[in-house]
Curated annotation (Swiss-Prot):
The gene is waaB. GO terms for molecular function: glycosyltransferase activity. Pathway: Bacterial outer membrane biogenesis; LPS core biosynthesis. Galactosyltransferase involved in the biosynthesis of the core oligosaccharide region of lipopolysaccharide (LPS). Catalyzes the addition of galactose from UDP-galactose to the first glucose residue of the LPS outer core. Keywords: Glycosyltransferase, Lipopolysaccharide biosynthesis, Transferase. This is Lipopolysaccharide 1,6-galactosyltransferase. It comes from the Bacteria.
Amino acid sequence: MKIAFIGEAVSGFGGMETVISNVIHTFENSSPKINCEMFFFCRNDKMDKAWLKEIKYAQSFSNIKLSFLRRAKHVYNFSQWLKETSPDIVICIDVISCLYANKARKKSGKHFTIFSWPHFSLDHKKHAECITYADYHLAISSGIKEQIMARGISAQDISVVYNPVSIKTVIVPPPERDKPAVFLYVGRLKFEGQKRVKDLFDGLARTTGEWQLHIIGDGSDFEKCQAYSRELGIEQRVIWYGWQSAPWQVVQQKIKNVTALLLTSAFEGFPMTLLEAMSYGIPCISSDCMSGPRDMIKPGLNGELYTPGAIDDFVGHLNRVISGEVKYQHDIIPGTIERFYDVLYFKNFNNAIFSKLQK
């Protein structure tokens, strides 16, 4: 059986790439009869390909400015590739690729099943309507399932598969009782927009009690975020690490104790930083944004949720943690995310695909 994963060029550094490569390697290791390849639609050859090690891939290049001509070239190139490779399944890692796959299927005369597998919120992406060109759908969160259904697709054609996280052997403990609370942010630094780091700083600036914030990540607003911390007078409590290739090693080796990971996003696809934190026993205080956090966080057990933009509620959660009024058992938190661990994830992903093929 041949499975093709297709999509527009990606950065090569994100969590999406990690998930895709893990899925491909797991499929191929599960059976010698399964062969996976990738096909990318590119404007240039700037994509970092280190993550594609041991993965066979092909590319279609077009930098034509007129979108309908650019798309026509991609469809033609992909249809030629389909004639050569004859996949049984095509999994689209973004929505525009559903359109390419559908048109190329007709053009090539090949028969295969198209799955969409979008990794971002549909309400914040262009061409979201193109998802209807797929036959079936793999949703990485219950929120994205709702977004797919809102575009006229039956719930029977959608499987919620989430994203996987590996089981850890280490628990990151909280600080000792007489020490300041230690908060953690891991991710891109966008002052407003998607990540709302401004809300993170505004909330912390309004808390009572002692705390530190450790920030692991970089982004276009790095300097703007630093300047805002100075403006609020909290710069002495914020420790900046910049981008790190192994952020959780930094947490274990340098930070060592964490009270909670914080996420103040306006929207997400499936924020893996929450799952990674909880796999180490770290509770998470997150906005209940579309989509992902509500699938992972069980309030009072492994963290808390608040309405995006509701800074008063966010501050309330922070104050209760800082004062010790609310405590979490770090050692039981990894058990609260059991359904996201690798073995169960791949079993569900496999079933989501092959159950549809048997129809």
